[in-house]
Amino acid sequence: MSAQNSLFSGSIVALVTPMNHYGEVDFSCLEKLVEHHIEAGSNALVSVGTTGESATLSIEENVKVIEKTVEFAKGRIPIIAGAGANATSEAITMTKLLRDSGVAGCLSVVPYYNKPTQEGIYQHFKAIAECTNLPQILYNVPSRTGSDMKPETVARLAEIENIVGIKEATGDVSRIVKIKQLAGKNFIVLSGDDATGLEAIKLGAEGVISVTNNIAAKDMADMYRYALVGDFDKAEEINARLMRLHHDLFIESNPIPVKWAAYRLGLIKSSHLRLPLTTLSEEIQPKVEDALKIAGLL
């Protein structure tokens, strides 16, 4: 595994952004989360991605959260910055602002809502890559964006030097094989789907950017450490215990359930989210609590 591949591999946390009851970012809590994941053995953190509520933070807030996450990490764990937008110019602005932030790379989502063609998607990511030397990880999540970046488009983008990988969040593990075939073995493929993450590793993915990791960090780190050395019996044992949790953390829109679960476990002080997201419905809370118990977290 190359140095770059090892930097973006294993158990990567799609980190929540803790907030107080007024909707302000709770930086003291964020610092504790960073320490928690370092101690648990997580391999990297994604700051202000989908799970970090990037859509409801201003550009200035996004940058500050990322910079503080890097500061708290003190070089002990790679930080990947969420830097996507559905306007190419805005994504470029965000990426440029991160130039000297100390991040290991940027995660940039397929433009959402405006539904570009495959050529539009290609030109979008090409323009972002050309504005920076930072490694770029593409992010395909059609269930949220309304656009699906095809493996053939990924392969074209893989020819650009600083586009180094993709977070593939369709949940279709056959995509892992297809992208590896078309983009080459050195192109990093990260699963973005907890329920199929272990299967993705078996098919050649280098790691998983995980929501479950927020609340089961040590289990997830252990599971993917076992998986990446081929000890799938031990990995499957952990995964079976977490499978209910993988599913129930999406029982309402992410990051609603995971923030409530993190609050329930005492990892954050509040389950507050910014509107239009609201805290986990009371009638759903017992179901997520049961999943936490099955996982051995309560």
UniProtKB/Swiss-Prot annotation:
A molecular-function term among this protein's GO annotations: 4-hydroxy-tetrahydrodipicolinate synthase activity
Keywords, A to Z? Amino-acid biosynthesis, Cytoplasm, Diaminopimelate biosynthesis, Lyase, Lysine biosynthesis, Schiff base
Q: What is its EC number?
A: 4.3.3.7
Q: Give the pathway.
A: Amino-acid biosynthesis; L-lysine biosynthesis via DAP pathway; (S)-tetrahydrodipicolinate from L-aspartate: step 3/4
- A single Pfam family it belongs to is DHDPS
Catalysed reaction, written as an equation: L-aspartate 4-semialdehyde + pyruvate = (2S,4S)-4-hydroxy-2,3,4,5-tetrahydrodipicolinate + H2O + H(+)
Cite a single GO BP annotation.
Answer: lysine biosynthetic process via diaminopimelate
Question: What InterPro entries does the annotation carry?
Answer: Aldolase_TIM, DapA, DapA-like, Schiff_base-form_aldolases_AS, Schiff_base-form_aldolases_CS
User: What does the function comment of this entry state?
Assistant: Catalyzes the condensation of (S)-aspartate-beta-semialdehyde [(S)-ASA] and pyruvate to 4-hydroxy-tetrahydrodipicolinate (HTPA).
Identify this protein by name.
Answer: 4-hydroxy-tetrahydrodipicolinate synthase
What species is this protein from? Haemophilus influenzae (strain PittGG)
Q: Which lineage is the organism of this entry classified under, starting from the top rank?
A: Bacteria, Pseudomonadati, Pseudomonadota, Gammaproteobacteria, Pasteurellales
